From Swiss-Prot:
It is found in: Cytoplasm. Pfam families: CoaE (PF01121). The keyword Transferase applies. Pathway: Cofactor biosynthesis; coenzyme A biosynthesis; CoA from (R)-pantothenate: step 5/5. The lineage of its organism: Bacteria, Bacillati, Bacillota, Bacilli, Bacillales. SUPFAM superfamilies: P-loop containing nucleoside triphosphate hydrolases. Residues 2-201 form the DPCK domain. ATP binds at residues 10-15. One of its GO terms (cellular component) is cytoplasm. One of its GO terms (biological process) is coenzyme A biosynthetic process. It comes from Halalkalibacterium halodurans (strain ATCC BAA-125 / DSM 18197 / FERM 7344 / JCM 9153 / C-125) (Bacillus halodurans). This is Dephospho-CoA kinase.
Amino acid sequence: MMIGLTGGIASGKSSVAKMMEELGLPIVDADQVARDVVEPGMPAYEAIVAHFGTGVVNDDGTLNRKALGSIVFQQEEERRVLNEIVHPAVRRQMQQQKEQLIRSGEKTIVFDIPLLYESNLFYLVEKVLLVYVDEHTQLQRLMNRDQAGKDDAIHRIRSQRPLESKRDRADAIIDNSGTLDATKRQLIDILKRWKVIPEDQ
């Protein structure tokens, strides 16, 4: 079974991914893949430098994410160009990892994709598992975690699709407003229901 794990910023999705890993499930991490495909020498890296110029490259040859970010944040057309370079490379790499894991005998694979809805990557997965918290909890956690001011935190939360609107397409929802133990119990119940782990685990 291919499971898409998603959530919003500061929803606690990473904690759930860690729990799934501890249960022995292989994780394909979209954020890590997105970092890997823009490493020096990779085709996406070369395409970014060709388009945006050497101003987005650090002295050590790696991408200067801050410089690139300030360009694409302000200019929608440049953001579209960047997405057209990076997104296909990420999809290809994730597909390759999926095929590799299937060849090695894995029956269940977890795709940790923060922007599963926004990137429309549903075709990769059979089930969507949404890690949910209400916006008030999300705001408090983000401010505590990143030492962010309230306005900045609200802006970052609102730049993503609201968690509330993601509930409709989720096959299962974990309410992560409580303790980690409560979250883990919900996760295990869902995985048993989906027959990913045995009933007696």
